[in-house]
Amino acid sequence: MFLVGLTGGIASGKSTVSSQLKELGCPVIDADVVARKVVEPQTAAYRLIVRHFGQEVLSENGEIDRKKLGQIIFSSPEKRRLLNSITHPEIHKEMLKQILLYFIKGYRYVILNVPLLFETRRLTRFLTHTVVVYCDPATQLSRLMQRDALSQTEAEQRISAQMPLKEKRGLANHVIENSGSREDTHRQVLRLHSKLDDCMQFLIIRAVAVAALTGLGGLFIYTVKIITS
C-alpha cells in the first residue's frame, strides 16, 4: 500500500477534488473531519483547548465554536502555534489508525487530505505522491469571502496564515489547476486517478519484497510510537 498526500490552500478546492476522488472509489482520509473528531467534548485535545483558550471558545452546547476559535488564532501566530501543538498530534494519531485499517482491508493506496501537509511536514516522508489543488490568488480570495462571509481583510488574514499556494505548487508531484470550471477540474482528477492506477501493479510487487525497508515499515514504527506516547 502507498500513500498520496492531497493538499492546497484555504478555499482552493481541496474538498471538491477529495469528493471527486471518493466518487471514483478512492479511500480518502480527511484531516478536517478528523480534526473535528479529536476536539469533541471530553477528549484530551478539547480539555487542553478550553484550558488555554478559555470558556469563551465554547458554543452554548459545550462544543468548540470553530468560528470563535478561528478569530483568535488567525489574528495571533502564537495562539495558532499553540492550537496546532495541541491538535496536530491527536489528528496524526487518528489518521494513522485509519491508514492501518485501510491496509488491513486490502486497499492498495490511501489519499490523505491534509490542508497543512507541507507546513507541518510530519507525514511527507511516508508519501509516494503529493498533490496540490491550486487556484490563482484572486479566485482564492473571492471564494473564501463568499464561502465564509468574510471581509476582504479577514479573508486575506486567513490566506496569509498558510504557506502560499505558489510555494506549495512547487513542492508537489502533481498539480490540479482549480481556477476554472468544475468540469475542467474533474478531467484533471480523472487523469490523476489514471496515473495512480497505472503505478499500482508495480508498487504491489515491489511492496512484497521491500515493505519492511520502505516508508510503510517506517509508518508502522511511527504509528506505534505515536499511539503509545
Swiss-Prot record:
Keywords: ATP-binding, Nucleotide-binding. GO terms for biological process: coenzyme A biosynthetic process. Signal peptide: none annotated. InterPro entries: Depp_CoAkinase (IPR001977), P-loop_NTPase (IPR027417). HAMAP family: Dephospho_CoA_kinase. ATP binds at residues 8-15. This is Dephospho-CoA kinase domain-containing protein. It comes from Danio rerio (Zebrafish). Residues 3-207 form the DPCK domain. NCBIfam families: dephospho-CoA kinase (TIGR00152). CDD domains: DPCK. The keyword ATP-binding applies. Belongs to the CoaE family. It comes from the Eukaryota. GO terms for molecular function: ATP binding; dephospho-CoA kinase activity. The lineage of its organism: Eukaryota, Metazoa, Chordata, Craniata, Vertebrata. Pfam families: CoaE.
